[in-house]
Amino acid sequence: MEQTDGEILLEMNHVKKSFDGNGVLEDISLTVKKGEVVSIIGPSGSGKSTLLRCATLLEKMDGGELIYLGQTAASEKTDKNGRVQCEYASKAELHKIRKCFGLVFQNFNLFPHYTVMKNIIDAPIHVDKVSRTEAVARAEKLLAQLGLSDKADAYPYQLS
C-alpha cells in the first residue's frame, strides 16, 4: 500500500456505532488525505474516542464503510433478514491495513505485568509477525543503545 501526494489515506462513510441501543456515532463521514491534519473536537461523551477506535479497528462499527488507501476494511451489508451490519475484511487483509497507521495513546503506560523486554518485543511479534528470536535481538540492541541492558528483566514499577 504505497502513498502518493493528495491521496486519500482514510475514508469513513456513514459510520454508525451504538452501545446498548444508545447511538454514539450516527452517519459520520470523513476523508483524510496525505498531508492533512485533522482535529476531532467535542464535549466529553460525544463519541470522539469511539470514532477513533472505529477508525483504527479497535472497535467494530455497526454500519458504514471504512477504507484505508483504497482498500476496504469494512463495508455495510444487509443480511437476509434486513438487518444492517458491517462486514470486515479477512484477518490477513486487516493485518496489512493495521500496518498503515500507528497509535499514540493519551495515557501511555507499559503493561505492568510484563518485563521491559516483554513490553518491547510484544508488538513486533504479534503485529509484524517477527520471530521471537529476532524481536529479542532487536530489543537487546535497542536497550544497549539506551544504556538500559540491565533493565531487560525489570518490571515497569521498578523503573524510575
Identify the role of each PLM range:
Residues 41-43:
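The feature captures the beta-strand-to-loop junction immediately N-terminal to the Walker
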Residues 56:
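Helix-to-loop junction immediately C-terminal to a conserved catalytic motif
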Residues 154-160:
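Conserved ABC ATPase signature
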Residues 1-16:
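ABC-family P-loop ATPase nucleotide-binding domain
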